[in-house]
Amino acid sequence: MPSQLEALRRHTVVVADTGDFEAMRALRPTDATTNPSLILKAVQQEAYRPLLVQTARAHQGASPAEITDRLLVAFGRQILDIVPGRVSTEVDARLSFDTRATVERARGLIALYQAAGVPRERVLIKIASTWEGIQAARVLQAEGIRCNLTLLFCLPQAAACADAGVQLISPFVGRIYDWHKKNAGAEWVEDARRGANDPGVQSVSRIYRYYKRFGIETEIMGASFRNVDQILALAGCDLLTISPELLTRLSQTEGEVPAALSPQAGHDDADAVRLDGGEVAFRTQLNEDAMASEKLSEGIRLFVADARKLDALIESHGAA
């Protein structure tokens, strides 16, 4: 009998959500995703600290922002030596509300990759799913720079991304689960909210059906998992990005994994209505969704905090 990981691969592209090269070699994902928090975690480990030191010292006198981008690309290049597919590299979250600056930073990242001999087709630029971020992605996609819109918590965000023609979205599962569990308090019944009844799973499933119903080609990559049940409940999603810990658990557990999602499911939603992708509708609908608006803001704050910590590490190694 196959492992659950091998069985999952029959339905879904498996992506590693980590900056740990050794974990990728062991688990053999197709793609990999990184973010400021994962890179910060990696460079604090002895095995990866030399990459930080070498990058910082090679570009002394450059700004922390420039060194950070070079460090992200250094990680990305090594990741692409391991995975056969793509790597996602994130634009500084401090630019989440600045369309022009996001576009310029993304162009710079792609230029660094291309200077290192990496074709742009193997890189996804991660951008927060704010209105400004989505509009930056619209510009970048038109230039042939493929984007991964992250911190996505609701259908209106996904609809706006589709209208912008982005390559891929990363709707979060675990953080939605966290919010609902916290807000339910004593009324939360864990066993009743597992699998297909998990609010995070339901959100991604809704987005998946919407995209398939309207023939939207943007790829859907479920992200932010808290447990294996959430992953198995989304088998069949285009891609799933999963932590090494959960990938290992899947690899060590035998069992078949049936597809929970299929393109046909979208066609069953005959009454679905295409959402207005305009700015007013986007901002109104996001504001009315307490969970999505709170988790988007929180996610940006957390990434900004880790970006500042990374700046401090770079400065401590003589890059400032």
Curated annotation (Swiss-Prot):
One of its GO terms (cellular component) is cytoplasm. Pathway: Carbohydrate degradation; pentose phosphate pathway; D-glyceraldehyde 3-phosphate and beta-D-fructose 6-phosphate from D-ribose 5-phosphate and D-xylulose 5-phosphate (non-oxidative stage): step 2/3. Disulfide bonds: none annotated. CDD domains: Transaldolase_TalAB. The active site is at 126 (schiff-base intermediate with substrate). It is found in: Cytoplasm. This is Transaldolase.
